[in-house]
Regions:
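A short, Lys/Arg-rich alpha-helix, primarily the initiator
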Residues: 1-17
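Short alpha-helical DNA-recognition segment
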Residues: 17-35
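DNA major-groove recognition helix of helix-turn-helix/homeodomain DNA-binding modules
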Residues: 46-61
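Short amphipathic recognition helices of helix-turn-helix/homeodomain-type DNA-binding modules
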Residues: 59-73
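Conserved beta-strand hairpin/beta-sheet module of binuclear metal-dependent hydrolase folds
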Residues: 69-118, 190-203, 209
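Core dinuclear metal-dependent hydrolase active-site scaffold
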Residues: 93-96, 165-195
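Metallo-beta-lactamase
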Residues: 109, 120, 184-253
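Active-site HxH/HxHxD metal-binding segment of metal-dependent hydrolases
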Residues: 109-176
């Protein structure tokens, strides 16, 4: 299940472009009532195609958003830990390569994460990397630090600092930080090198089928610029590990 359905994609784009539903409707040749009905869950591929150019979205992708699901992840080295968060979920990602284990983010409360790690026979990962300081990503961090796990992040209490462009070598893996601010400020993505394919942990900057919400139009444009800057050089087969929802690939997005 995607983190955002088509109504959230619409609302995030409208907010990011400082457009009202009426303004978007007028520019797209639609009625305001059609756009409002779409925003409330009445999907229409035709309306999606009409709105997409106004919202700077891919028309074919937006028209298909109601059916879109990325291909399932089939890598034994990467495990999605699906953790509860309010009425939804949040991800932690466990990455194993030979004797090296990494954890990306830690959920909102420690108990479900610690239980999952114990069940996976990995109570103490070799290192933790935190994408950003929102509460649903750092809740398990203090307990894991107390277990002796080194943690890395940017402006996150208890972590060793890592800045965009810097890297850390953990066992067989190299983790390189990049700037994915916009939804959160600061916010890091983590390139993970040494696996069988390129991997980028995106936090809440990018989900399958959408991006993280931004507080202002300026931050929305900033977020898009940082995503383009980070993603453009990467090969299409790059695996993307988001903070919510399923893993995806650069080619899929």
């Amino acid at each position: 299940m995607l983190e955002d359905d088509f109504t959230y994609v619409l609302r995030k784009a409208l907010k990011g472009l400082a457009l009202s539903p009426g303004e978007a409707a007028s520019r797209a040749g639609l009625t305001e009532n059609e756009v409002l009905a779409f925003s409330r869950g009445l999907f229409s591929a035709e309306i999606a195609r009409s709105l997409a150019p106004i919202l700077h979205l891919n028309p074919a992708a937006f028209a298909n958003h109601n059916q879109y699901q990325p291909q399932p992840l089939h890598l034994h080295t990467i495990r999605r830990i699906d953790l509860p968060f309010e009425d939804g979920q949040v991800n932690a990602w466990l990455i194993r390569e030979d004797d090296t284990t990494l954890l990306i983010d830690t959920g909102i409360t420690p108990q479900p994460l610690l239980a999952a790690l114990d069940a996976l026979a990995c109570p103490k990962p070799d290192a933790i990397f935190i994408t950003h300081a929102h509460r649903d990503h750092i809740g398990g961090l203090p307990e894991l630090i107390a277990r002796g796990c080194p943690a890395f992040g940017h402006e996150i209490p208890g972590t060793q600092p890592i800045l965009p462009g810097q890297s850390r070598r953990i066992g067989q893996l190299t983790i390189r930080a990049c700037d994915l601010s916009g939804h959160a400020n600061p916010s890091l993505g983590f390139h993970i090198e040494g696996l069988t394919r390129p991997v980028l942990a995106t936090g809440d900057a990018l989900f399958a089928g959408s991006i993280g919400g931004c507080a202002t139009p300026a931050l929305y444009q900033h977020a898009l610029a940082k995503l383009r800057e980070t993603l453009t050089p990467l090969p299409p087969r790059t695996l993307l590990l988001p903070g919510h929802g399923p893993a995806t690939t650069l080619s899929g997005e």
